[in-house]
Amino acid sequence: MTQVSHIGSSHFNINSSIKTALPLINSQYNSLVNESTISSNINLPFRLDAPSLFNGLPEEWGPTDAELSTHSNVNYPGLTEATIDYKFCSTLNSYFDTNQRFGNVPNDTYLMANSMAANIENNSWHNSRYYFDGNHPLSQWLPVPVNCWSNNNYIRDDFYDKSIQEEEFKSRSVLQTNEKNSTNVSSDINHYKPLITDENENLKMTKPTHNLLNNDSINLCRFPQNEIIMPDLINAPSPTLTNNNLFYSCGDHRSGKTEDLPSSDDLEQFAKMFKQRRIKLGYTQADVGLALGTLYGNVFSQTTICRFEALQLSFKNMCKLRPLLQKWLHEADSSSESPTNFDKISAQSRKRKKRTSIEANVKSILESSFMKLSKPSAQDISSLAEKLSLEKEVVRVWFCNRRQKEKRITPSFDVNEQFDNEVSSTMPYSTLNDDRNEKTIKNSFENHEKLIKQTGETNHEQNNNSSVKRLKIRKEPDQISINDENTSCRAESSGIVPDTHYRQECDNHSICGYNIHDIHESSVLMSDPVSFYPRSFFMKNNIYSNGTTPTLFDHSQMI
C-alpha cells in the first residue's frame, strides 16, 4: 500500500513498498524532507478501472454523504492543489516519456509524474487517491488495493454526483469514449464478469488516447468502456451431462448462444445406420474417405471412417464429420437410382475383392492334397483348380494360408537340415536308419566338445570319456510301452531333446523310436542338461510308474 507523507505547503514525498509507486529522485530526496512539517500519513489506492471512479466510490474510501456538504471546502491532509509545487514537478521527467520511451532512464528513477491534472478540484480526499494525468501511459497498471477486487462492487454513481463531475477530469484509461457509463448497471456484477454484448449493449469499442496503441492492436482485443474485465472462472458455463457422457457446449462464449449439437444417442444411431448403408451399397471405408476428398475437398483416411463407425472419435470430431457423411450418403443413395458422376468418382478407388467361401467337400479334398504335398507346383495348382472348378488364384492362396496355419500349430525344433528332410507332414517324428544314428551321436559328441572349450572347463577329457559310457542308443523294432523298465526318449541330430510338448505327445502316442538305457548314474551331465538325463532322475521323480501318463518335469529339478 502506498503512503504519502505531507512535507509542507510546497513539496511532498512518496514512500512506497512498491518500487514503481513514484519515488522521487534520490539526489533530491534529502533536500525535500522537512520533518517538522510532516503530518499524518494517508493511503493511496490506485484502481485499474480509474475512469469509473466518476460513478462513485465505496463508503470506506471517503467521508459519508452527510460530511460532503460540511467538509467540501476543507483541505484534508494529502495532495491538494495548494500542496503541489508545479515548478518542482515540472523538473521531474516521466519514466515512460512518449519520446524517450524506455531509453536513458536514470538508475535511481522508477516512475515520475509530470504534474497534477490541470482541472483537478480542491478536494484533498479525492485528490490524494487520484492525481495522475489521464494521458500517463501507466495509468492502468498502478498498484490496486485488495478490497478493490474482493468486495465485488462497482463504483457507485450516487455518491460522487453531488460533488465531482466527470467532465471536469481527464480520462485515465488508455481507451477513451465520450459517452457516460450507464447508471443502471447491476450492482451484483463484479470485475470478473465476462464481456457479453447481449447483456450490456452500452459496452462499446473505444478509441485509444495514447500513441503506444495503434488501430491494428486495438482491433485484436476488446475492452469494455473504461474497464478491464477479467474472465469469470467462478460463473463460467457449467458442462452439460448428456446420456452419461460429459460434453462441453461448443457455442460462442461472447454471444452467449450455443449451437444445436446432436446427442450421443443420435451419433451412435447415425454411425450404425451409415455403416449398414455403406456395406449395402458396396463401398469400403477407404472409398468413402476418397470420395469425401474428391467431392468436398476434405480427404479422410480409412482409419478415420473406421473410428467414426466405431464411435472412437471425440465428440467434437464426430459432430464435424457427421454432416459430410450425411451428404455423401445422400449422393450415394441418389446415384444408386440414377447413375451420375458419383459412380465415376467412386470407381476410382480400389474395390475390395469379395471373400471366397469354400464348401466342406472341396475343403476336404484340399486338405488331403496338402497332406500329400504342402508346396505344390504351378502345374499341380492348375490341375487341382480345374478339378475342383475353382480359380487358380484361389487354390494358390489357400495353400499359402494353410502353410502359415501349419507353422502356427506345429512346434519348430532346432534340427539339422538332413533330419528336417526326413520328417513327413503326417509323421514329423519318424525314425532314422542306423547309419544316420551313428552320425547323429558323433555330431552330439563334437558339439559337446565345442561347448566345453567355450566354457573353459578343465575336466574336458573326463567329461568326454564319461559321455561315451553314459549313452548307448539302439533302435527298437516295435513300439515301446510306457511301463518299460528303461526310459523312452528320442535323440535328435542336434543332441537336444524336444520340448515338453513333444515329450508329452511322444509318450501319449508311443511313437518314440529310441531307448536310453544303461546310463551311468555317477556320470557328469553334459553342458546341455536337456539332452541327457541320468537314470536316478527318472526314478526319483517317478516319471514312469504304474502305467500312468508321464508328467511334465521341470529342467531345474535335475540333479
Curated annotation (Swiss-Prot):
SUPFAM superfamilies per the UniProt record, alphabetical: Homeodomain-like, lambda repressor-like DNA-binding domains
Listed Gene3D superfamilies: Homeodomain-like, lambda repressor-like DNA-binding domains
The entry's keywords: DNA-binding, Homeobox, Nucleus
InterPro entries attached to this UniProt entry: HD, Homeobox_CS, Homeodomain-like_sf, Lambda_DNA-bd_dom_sf, POU, POU_dom, POU_domain_TF
Pfam family, one: Pou
Domain of life: Eukaryota
SMART domains hit by this protein: HOX, POU
Localization, UniProt: Nucleus
Cellular component aspect of the GO annotation: nucleus
Annotated GO MF terms: DNA-binding transcription factor activity, RNA polymerase II-specific; RNA polymerase II cis-regulatory region sequence-specific DNA binding
PROSITE patterns in the record: HOMEOBOX_1, HOMEOBOX_2, POU_1, POU_2, POU_3
TM helices/strands, residue ranges: none
Ranges of the DNA-binding region feature: 351-410
Family per record: Belongs to the POU transcription factor family.
Protein name: POU domain protein 1
Organism: Dugesia japonica
